[in-house]
Every structure is written in structure tokens, then in C-alpha cells.
Regions:
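Charged, low-complexity intrinsically disordered terminal segments
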Residues: 1-233
């Protein structure tokens, strides 16, 4: 109780001394009701980990009825991860992922691995959208149907799956799902859909980032020299 009293007094003192800096905002008016919130985490020990977050996200996505939409900066998968996506694609009518294009990706390892494995990703049945916004996209979120939202630090890569201690917040709320979708669509309007023949569907008339010769050389160099260590990136 003493600590709480000290905290309240400290806040009141700060408020009186900084009135002009404090905005007049009632944050309660800007919140949404939720049915449930859960935090999903990988184990916290150092070294290799059981892919807890991947398993749990996979089960959530497999149980979707209509759609799953993923945003991730990087895609670096192994067989187990590709198989999870195949299962989701077989069950869910609308299954898509947005990631950086090869030219737009700020991570040379992620860019090189994606360039090499793009067709394999497509073969899982997932629709790929490539972001061309001019700066490397770094959002990590998932929409499941119209009521489930997942936001956090997890990339769709092996490092997040097996090495890092990642967190994802799972929220059941139609209002938050709608708000998150609006934010995600702002980026998708600067993206193009990759088709199976290597061409693009471009409903938003996006100007793609140029894949320079220097960038192409760097991609090839990383593929040849560091492909063996792809799970680290």
C-alpha cells in the first residue's frame, strides 16, 4: 500500500508540473472489447528450442473457416513448415502471405533465400504478395477469419521457429481484427501478387523496385556461400 501511495503521489506531482505536455486523451474511448487475449511464447532457454509458437499458430490457422492472411518480412522455411502451410491451404479457401520482394528486402539473407525458394512456397498453395514500398517492411501479424488477430515478433523463418524466444499476442475481437486488416491493407495496396508462371497480378498498379545488377550479384553470392546457414538468418 505504501508503494501504491508513493506511485500516486509521484504521478500527481508529475502531472501538476507538466500539464502543458500531457495530451487530453481518454484512452478508454479508444479501446475495444475483447472476448479473449492469450500470449504465445517460445521457451526462454538459450540454444535450440521446441517450435512452440509455430505449432500453436499452425493450429489456429488450420482451424480457420474462411481466410488466413499473414504479413512477415522474411520467409525461410524447412520441410515441416512448408507442410504446415500445405495443410492450411487445403483447408482454408483464402490463404495469403505478404512479404518483401527480393529488391525491397533489407535483409540480404532473407532476400536470397526467398528468391531461391519462391516457387516452393507457391507450391504449398499459399498466395504470395510482394511488398514494393521502397523500404523494407517489418510487420509481423496474422488475420484469421473476421475475429482473430495475431501480432508480435515472430517471423516466418527458421530462426524465429527454432532459436529465438518470440512472442505473439492472440486477440479474439472483431473490432481489432477489422482495425488490423485496415492497417495491413495499406501495405498490400503497394504490393503485387506472384503467379505460378513467375509473372505478376498487379491490381493496385504498383511500380516495382528495381532489382539492380549489384543486388542480383549479392543475392547469388549469399545463396552460394551461406545457404548452409539459412536457419540462422
Amino acid at each position: 500500500m505504501l508503494f501504491r501511495s508513493e506511485l500516486q503521489n509521484g504521478y500527481q506531482k508529475y502531472f501538476e508540473e507538466n500539464k502543458e505536455r500531457i495530451c487530453d486523451t481518454n484512452y478508454t474511448d479508444e479501446t475495444f472489447e475483447t472476448e479473449k487475449i492469450a500470449l504465445v511464447s517460445n521457451p526462454i532457454h538459450t540454444g535450440p528450442k521446441e517450435p512452440v509458437v509455430w505449432y500453436q499458430l499452425g493450429e489456429l490457422m488450420k482451424n480457420a473457416k474462411e481466410r488466413v492472411k499473414i504479413h512477415t518480412p522474411y520467409i525461410i522455411c524447412n520441410d515441416m513448415m512448408y507442410n504446415t502451410w500445405k495443410e492450411i491451404a487445403e483447408r482454408v479457401p483464402d490463404f495469403s502471405i505478404m512479404t518483401n520482394s527480393v529488391a525491397n528486402n533489407g535483409n540480404p539473407f532473407g532476400s536470397a533465400d526467398y528468391a531461391r525458394n519462391r516457387n516452393r512456397i507457391l507450391n504449398t498453395g499459399i498466395d504470395i504478395w510482394e511488398y514494393e514500398g521502397g523500404y523494407s517492411y517489418h510487420g509481423k501479424s496474422i488475420l484469421i477469419d473476421d475475429d482473430l488477430s495475431v501480432i508480435g515478433s515472430f517471423n516466418m523463418d527458421m530462426r524465429s521457429t527454432y532459436l529465438d524466444t518470440e512472442l505473439m499476442l492472440v486477440i479474439r475481437s472483431k473490432e481489432i481484427n477489422k482495425q488490423l486488416e485496415e492497417g495491413m491493407m495499406e501495405y498490400e495496396r503497394v504490393s503485387r501478387q506472384v503467379l505460378e508462371d513467375g509473372t505478376y497480378r498487379d491490381p493496385y498498379h504498383v511500380e516495382p523496385i528495381e532489382l539492380t545488377k549489384k543486388r542480383q550479384r549479392n543475392v547469388l553470392l549469399v545463396q552460394h556461400l551461406l545457404g548452409w546457414a539459412r536457419y540462422l538468418f
